[in-house]
């Protein structure tokens, strides 16, 4: 199996959540993905390849959101689920890498369960609402409720990627519309609404571990200013891509290198 990639179910709260693991390292890395339309099931090999840089140093884990998302679920609730999954697998003192909504969840994980977090990476995320994220999420919810998946996928691409990237891949938009159609519309809407429940800013001082903030100045999903707010509040290390936006984690070739260097203290050779 490529990079020892595996898929399994993790039992918690009388339910099972999809779990991906890969890598063969002694240390644990918890990756918390952002809002997505499809979930992580079936993505173990592609994710292992995308984050192969971490596979020797770490055993990497990703936990999907719970299958039945209750109305009004918050990102803090999701952090509680991640903590429960880590407890179920006996994982403690892990490095944690949260992207977008995953970064919101990661903040609450570090605040509420400091025993679980050794180092923390907060990528293209926020700690409190702002007009950019509010308008973005509200539009995505409306488009989903209307069943306008074509415009939803196009709007996601325009807001996430650089203009050059969107122009290059515009011919593939019809294919993306099919591939990114939400499997469960109601679940996606509830998860999207949860993006507006992050209010960790006034509790950031409770985070006890080293933190690295990384983002894009041109972020049209959560706003480029959001990363700076977190880093200033924590007094932690930060790196911003001047010409990239929310999908800096995909577009920047050195993105994983920077995360790896912070977490391990090693340069990628």
Question: Which residues are covered by each model-predicted region?
Answer:
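Flexible "cap/lid" loop of the alpha/beta hydrolase fold
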Residues: 104-107, 111, 118-147
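Short beta-strand/loop motif that positions the catalytic acidic residue
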Residues: 207, 213-215, 219
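Catalytic histidine-centered segment of alpha/beta-hydrolase-like enzymes
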Residues: 244-257
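Conserved alpha/beta-hydrolase "nucleophile elbow" surrounding the catalytic nucleophile
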Residues: 94, 98-103, 216
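Conserved alpha/beta-hydrolase "acid-adjacent" motif
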Residues: 220-226
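Conserved alpha/beta-hydrolase catalytic His-Asp/Glu region
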Residues: 131-134, 150-203
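Conserved HGGG/HGGXW glycine-rich cap/lid loop of the alpha/beta-hydrolase fold
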Residues: 9-69
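Conserved acidic catalytic loop of the alpha/beta-hydrolase fold
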Residues: 77-94
């Amino acid at each position: 199996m490529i990079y020892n990639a595996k898929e399994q179910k993790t039992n918690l709260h009388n339910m099972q959540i999809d779990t991906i693991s890969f890598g063969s390292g002694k240390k644990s890395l918890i990756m918390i993905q952002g809002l997505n339309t499809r979930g992580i099931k079936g993505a173990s090999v592609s994710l292992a390849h995308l984050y192969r840089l971490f596979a020797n140093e770490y055993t990497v884990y990703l936990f999907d959101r719970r299958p039945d998302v209750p109305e009004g679920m918050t990102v803090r609730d999701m952090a509680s689920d991640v903590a429960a999954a880590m407890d179920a697998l006996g994982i403690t003192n892990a490095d944690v890498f949260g992207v977008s909504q995953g970064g919101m969840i990661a903040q609450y994980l570090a605040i509420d369960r400091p025993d679980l977090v050794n180092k923390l990476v907060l990528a293209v995320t926020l700690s409190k609402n702002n007009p950019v994220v509010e308008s973005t999420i509200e539009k995505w919810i409306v488009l989903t409720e209307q069943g306008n998946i074509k415009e939803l996928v196009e709007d996601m691409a325009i807001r996430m990627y650089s203009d050059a990237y969107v122009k290059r891949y515009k011919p593939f938009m019809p294919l993306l519309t099919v591939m990114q159609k939400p499997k469960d519309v109601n679940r996606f809407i509830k998860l999207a609404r949860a993006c507006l429940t992050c209010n960790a800013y006034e509790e950031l001082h409770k985070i006890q571990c080293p933190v690295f903030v990384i983002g894009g100045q041109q972020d049209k999903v959560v706003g480029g200013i959001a990363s700076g707010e977190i880093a200033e509040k924590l007094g932690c290390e930060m790196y911003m891509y001047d010409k990239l936006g929310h999908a800096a984690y995909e577009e920047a070739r050195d993105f994983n290198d920077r995360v790896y260097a912070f977490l391990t203290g090693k340069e990628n050779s």
